[in-house]
Regions:
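Hydrophobic transmembrane alpha-helices and their immediate junctions
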Residues: 338-377
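N-terminal signal-anchor transmembrane segment
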Residues: 2-62, 76-92, 376-380
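Alpha-helical transmembrane segments of multi-pass inner-membrane proteins
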Residues: 28, 115-119, 133-165, 176-243, ...
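Transmembrane alpha-helices of multi-pass inner-membrane enzymes
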Residues: 28, 49-55, 236, 369-379, ...
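Aromatic-anchored transmembrane helix interface
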Residues: 75, 93-125, 137-138, 143
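Long extracytoplasmic/lumenal interhelical loops at the membrane interface
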Residues: 279-336, 355
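A juxtamembrane structural motif centered on a specific transmembrane helix
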Residues: 1-25, 203, 360, 397-422
């Protein structure tokens, strides 16, 4: 769509001339920083999104469409804070004096993240179409470059990353550097979907193939199995929504709900039927360790199935659970019980239902959202802790990217609706 179209002008008018330009500046800043942080410092996604949220506060306008998912997340954060009253975790100082003290207050961090990340997601939905299209294009091309760089670096044993690291003056083993390179694949796996939609409208399949190949090669060499699984599952979701439309999207809602409801039961049934024991014999060491963690978590969920053990309780079980359960649904059940798992499940089902509504207008955009959503959930189900700041921030960034990727598409009559939450 032409940037001077009535739709684009309406979006700019709603935000105000100064506000619209400022949002465009913030969007460019975020997309330029994204590939740099993905490669050099993935933990930096947390401060990036927090800063973006603060920067857009003057332009923030809460809408009715954003209210339901935000209220669900507020309820989840409140329940998490309440659960601290019975959590076995020893709290830090009630009056934190430095960042180390804040690190121990997960409930406070969650509230701050919801405020800042949420502000970034909601405010950047008001980007004028021309600014969103520009930012989306920059991000897409930058991700292609990142995929090529990481693939080359992985094949060279992280030699490029080690060159950058010498600036810090600290030594790093090549195997550790390769692990650092692998972290970029998580951003690539999530942002592949909006980037591929943008590239498909501009250059056809060539750059998309390059982006996908670079991500797969890096994931394979660095043993980033979670990203390979995410791309496969996301690809299935993409195909289902792209070719079945609303029917496929409705099936997706059910598929997303199932793990939040049945995760502990599935593990316990697997133990009772001997499936878990069989998997222990078949899977490599890293997955064998996950099975042990999941079995332990499912067993302990039975002690407090409704209220859970309390926020951050996963950290208190010693070697049985190193830091977290490596499964988002089980961690929610273990720490926040059925209440927390239900709230999180409702939120993600709300997002998935947004894909159903989006499929009415554009199957390609709905398929993009489905692929990104499923990829995030798959990685969260086998790799990271639910409360890790950078991982939550990367999820928020994926929302923003999916919204921007819709600019210039065939269905932009509802330009304010940039994300599947609309």
């Amino acid at each position: 769509m032409n940037p001077s179209s009535p739709v684009a002008e309406a979006a700019a008018s709603n935000a105000g001339p100064w506000s619209a330009r400022w949002l465009g500046v913030v969007a460019i800043f975020v997309v330029v920083m994204t590939p740099l942080l993905a490669y050099l410092a993935p933990l930096g996604f947390a401060p990036l999104l927090a800063l973006a949220g603060v920067l857009v506060l003057p332009s923030l306008k809460l809408t009715r469409a954003a209210a339901p998912p935000l209220l669900i997340l507020v309820a989840l954060v409140v329940w998490a804070a309440i659960s601290m009253s019975w959590s076995p975790v020893v709290l830090g100082p009630l009056r934190p004096k430095n960042y180390g003290d804040i690190e121990t207050l997960t409930a406070l961090k969650l509230a701050l993240q919801l405020a800042t990340y949420g502000a970034a997601v909601v405010a950047l939905r008001e980007l004028p179409e021309a600014a969103a299209e520009r930012a989306a294009a920059i991000l897409a091309y930058a991700l292609v470059g990142l995929a090529v760089l990481t693939a080359l670096d992985a094949m060279m044993g992280a030699a490029i990353y080690l060159k950058f690291h010498t600036v810090t003056g600290e030594a790093m083993r090549p195997d550790v550097a390769l692990v650092k390179v692998s972290l970029a694949t998580y951003a690539l796996a999530l942002l592949f979907w909006p980037a591929s939609l943008v590239l498909s409208r501009r250059h056809g399949p060539l750059l998309i193939i390059l982006l996908l190949a670079g991500t797969i090669v890096t994931s394979k060499i660095t043993s980033s199995d979670a990203c390979l699984a995410a791309l496969a599952a996301g690809g299935f979701a993409w195909l289902m929504v792209r070719y079945l439309g609303q029917l496929g999207a409705k099936v997706l809602v059910g598929l997303i709900a199932i793990p939040f409801v049945t995760a502990p039961l599935v593990v316990l049934v697997g133990v009772q039927t001997g499936v878990v024991a069989w998997m222990h014999r078949m899977l490599p060491a890293s997955w064998d360790a996950r099975l042990d963690i999941w079995t332990f978590a499912a067993d302990h969920i039975q002690t407090h199935p409704f209220r859970g053990w309390g926020l951050d309780a996963s950290r208190t079980f010693g070697v049985a659970i190193p830091l977290h359960t490596h499964n988002g649904e089980l961690q929610l059940w273990l720490e926040l019980g059925a209440v927390g798992a239900a709230l999180a499940g409702v939120f993600f089902c709300w997002v998935a239902y947004g894909v159903v509504r989006l499929a009415q207008r554009s199957r390609s955009e709905a398929a993009m959202a489905a692929g990104a959503l499923v990829s995030y959930l798959v990685i969260g189900a086998i790799s990271f802790g639910v409360w890790q700041e950078w991982w939550i921030a990367l999820g928020a960034l994926t929302f923003i990217a999916c919204g921007m990727a819709r600019a210039g598409g065939e269905n932009t009559e509802n330009w304010g609706e940039l994300t599947p939450l609309s």
